[in-house]
Amino acid sequence: MAGTYSSTLKTLEDLTLDSGYGAGDSCRSLSLSSSKSNSQALNSSAQQHRGAAWWCYSGSMNSRHNSWDTVNTVLPEDPEVADLFSRCPRLPELEEFPWTEGDVARVLRKGAGGRRLPQFSAEAVRRLAGLLRRALIRVAREAQRLSVLHAKCTRFEVQSAVRLVHSWALAESCALAAVKALSLYSMSAGDGLRRGKSARCGLTFSVGRFFRWMVDTRISVRIHEYAAISLTACMENLVEEIRARVMASHSPDGGGAGGGEVSAEALEMVINNDAELWGVLQPYEHLICGKNANGVLSLPAYFSPYNGGSLGHDERADAYAQLELRTLEQSLLATCVGSISELSDLVSRAMHHMQGRHPLCPGASPARQARQPPQPITWSPDALHTLYYFLRCPQMESMENPNLDPPRMTLNNERPFMLLPPLMEWMRVAITYAEHRRSLTVDSGDIRQAARLLLPGLDCEPRQLKPEHCFSSFRRLDARAATEKFNQDLGFRMLNCGRTDLINQAIEALGPDGVNTMDDQGMTPLMYACAAGDEAMVQMLIDAGANLDIQVPSNSPRHPSIHPDSRHWTSLTFAVLHGHISVVQLLLDAGAHVEGSAVNGGEDSYAETPLQLASAAGNYELVSLLLSRGADPLLSMLEAHGMGSSLHEDMNCFSHSAAHGHRNVLRKLLTQPQQAKADVLSLEEILAEGVEESDASSQGSGSEGPVRLSRTRTKALQEAMYYSAEHGYVDITMELRALGVPWKLHIWIESLRTSFSQSRYSVVQSLLRDFSSIREEEYNEELVTEGLQLMFDILKTSKNDSVIQQLATIFTHCYGSSPIPSIPEIRKTLPARLDPHFLNNKEMSDVTFLVEGKLFYAHKVLLVTASNRFKTLMTNKSEQDGDSSKTIEISDMKYHIFQMMMQYLYYGGTESMEIPTTDILELLSAASLFQLDALQRHCEILCSQTLSMESAVNTYKYAKIHNAPELALFCEGFFLKHMKALLEQDAFRQLIYGRSSKVQGLDPLQDLQNTLAERVHSVYITSRV
């Protein structure tokens, strides 16, 4: 029976190393399908209700005795399940995160566009902002582990971390969002210091705060700005994905339209039913994948062989092929297996199906893959054995092998079903690890890393930098070439073991290139020794003739596993990355170029210099050593190859140290004397040269004898100032300002925002004093939308008189010296007009007014046509009293004021009227009451002409109460123009700070902000267009 059993199985070698993974003649029936699965048919209505077929739910099959019995087991309502999760390690609770609830609310509103969609309640926004923290921690933890390899976090580590944590569909969406943000950022390189990173990327979340959070959580000692942009874009995209799914479930038709408000309960319901979101947003350390809150296993809809009802190319598929296709979906949801052969068969068929449906690798351009078709990923035998260790089930082993009796007693507890990820997730995570290594083979290390991520209570160290050869590439070589490759692998292993006495034999085994041979990662033995800090081996390799300045190649089929960010690195670069100062000194003494490949390479060999890497890490000793050997902190600014670097994440050394908050390193860099090199000017700089020189001279004269900065160093320090302000290192920003580096408006606003949020009012005061040094050409929309809002917020909350006086000076400065816009007259002719002789004349009068006990005679025909107020008054009087009484009493108005108002009506205008100054406001009130717009506007003009420091506050209140907007606007301009002096008056302070203003419905500070914003926009922005 054993022989019969074994004869039905393929060998492990056949299952893992044959051409069936990518060949078209193996598992051919997997491409055939003639019907949907029953499970999908049952769940199609549920998917339609959700509006988007994100996931397909599969029911269990009537299988025989294999791993498919574990699929979609109904989770019993057992309190032990809750107790089980309570014992699982939980994610850390951090106090600070790089967003606020307001930021999340703005992202949710931005996603709605111009459509009228249900709004998220405040509680739902608060709940979502809290749940996002867990997703961020998961991605950050994986990026932190991936960054160990090169002691550096780039966009590649962030993108791989997102793919590890999120499902394929969600990760692809996040990758597209990151690509969009990075593209916008690169295309806006010309506005570098004028706009914030988030504005340049088109993001709502703050890229600067994300960068600072990554530094504070020590994801790596070096953080690239593109890594922060990618992480910001991914988290913002996650909010938009959640919003879209909530909207799809909120409306019956799935289009998102509908009334009402999205509650926190509705949000949680959508997340609990979504297998892509629920596990990611749980508080446990291990990642729950492919399951929703009910424990239902799920498969991505786009991966399902039955998705969309697509049929195979052979319509005559037999029943066996249909059954095989149906079982494939169940196979991917298996949580345990009974034998290594079964696992090998499942993995092989799944890989074949994946490569058939997804010919393009995620994140790679179709054009590049058309030139270099992607090779299929294979699984090494040790990877399958390791995976089987985590998926094996003793009971199923006994069922698979009739010769194996089940154990009478077990020494180990089986993991509960809720803790078992499906096979699909094991494969997804392991393949992602292999792809991050640029390897075509999944090895046992990838499986161990996946187990650490997917299972609770497991841990292992991150992958270390060591020689690795692509095992699958050997199979594509002939016997002789494969032998040479294995010998080369042996030579690297001999050198990697640390025995210097084997160096000659190892060099002989490496092949014709000898000690300069490169492995699949494009690295030489000297690079590995430098990364490991092995001084003895480095010295031996140098003595053996190793090339010190050889670079990691850019793109080469001979080296398929090169990490994209390591291209053009030299041995010195690796030593600096890992902080081995003794090895750095050894290489420099031996003649290694201190700038790495930045000078020796060709035009396409962009790479960060060792000094840039040391500056980013804050390694003071390394920076000092490299500077003493002639490293140039301004090398990137000089553009040695004559090409821009906006696509290369380029930052100069000053920027690296400032961005990471290393003040001591920045100070050390500043001690380096300026080199006497001719400044290369752009056309914009040539045209603005006169203005900038005068500005720079004025800046330098205010400081205590600083050395005059060259144009190149000024530009570099201004860039460093930008990064320190964006990332919240206000002390570094102020220190650079003290050197005479001129302000950019955005840098000033960010520094003020940080200082205010930290309640550092001494810095706030210093910044406010320095506002006048910013050139008016810098004033832009950011000053209108953010700068003024920030300054008025400070004015509302500050109790420091000095700060308040500085703000008043700034507001007056921004308002400008030009006069306040005058109030225009209303040229309006009255519809009817009588001779002035009839004014208060009893003759022919048909209506009488009683004002202060005195009668005033008038004529209806004139009054009714003068305003709707008079017409309504006449109509109401006739209906109430009939013709018995024609006297209308006017209260709360003086007789002579009423008389002047009537004089305006009978004279037909204001030309012949003489209005005493003391009566202007009362006449304005009367004109407003009786809706005489022209008279009211004339009174507003008279008030504006007589406005003084003493009467301004009272006039403003009158204008607000009696609906005189033009006069109120004029008063606000008067306030802004004389604000510093007005702040000395109690009446003005009571107006802007007192509670009585709020009781009266006044918000003078908001009105002042709006008026100043319009003024700045018209004077400084619109006029330049």
UniProtKB/Swiss-Prot annotation:
GO biological process: cellular response to toxic substance
SMART domains linked to this entry: ANK, BTB
ANK repeat ranges, renumbered to this chain: 521-550, 567-596, 606-635, 649-678
Metal-binding keyword on record: no
Every BTB domain range: 845-914
Coiled-coil annotated residue ranges, if any: none
Keyword flag Repeat: yes
CDD domains: BACK_ABTB2, BTB_POZ_ABTB2_BPOZ2, HFD_ABTB2-like
Superkingdom: Eukaryota
Keywords: ANK repeat, Repeat
UniProt function note: May be involved in the initiation of hepatocyte growth.
PANTHER family: ANKYRIN REPEAT AND BTB/POZ DOMAIN-CONTAINING, ANKYRIN REPEAT AND BTB_POZ DOMAIN-CONTAINING PROTEIN 2
Name assigned to this protein: Ankyrin repeat and BTB/POZ domain-containing protein 2
